[in-house]
């Protein structure tokens, strides 16, 4: 799906003109799909660390997923935060060790990058760790305690 979207954007949208017009470093394309409940993939984001177009990011959100429910507002927020560099905290990935994932599971972590609540309001928390990963806060002590990887903003 990524290549189809990336090709469409390259062929039809002048991303450089958008960056210049809005004095932006990056452009985020948010795709919203009106999907059925059956056979719908989970939402995903493809951003800076995983995209060959380092100044373009893609977010895909499927209105219905998981077989049973419509995507709640917290899902939108979670996916948008990916576009700014926040990693998922619910599985092991580069910079997120298993021990930290286990800790989040055992403590009932309410970080929006670990859990997305259902319902009309967002009750998940935007934490200092999230602020660090999206580039608006300092590296919190817990990142060093758990050996979490650097944010995209520290890595550049």
Sequence positions of predicted segments:
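Active-site-proximal segment of zinc-dependent metalloprotease catalytic domains
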Residues: 2-93
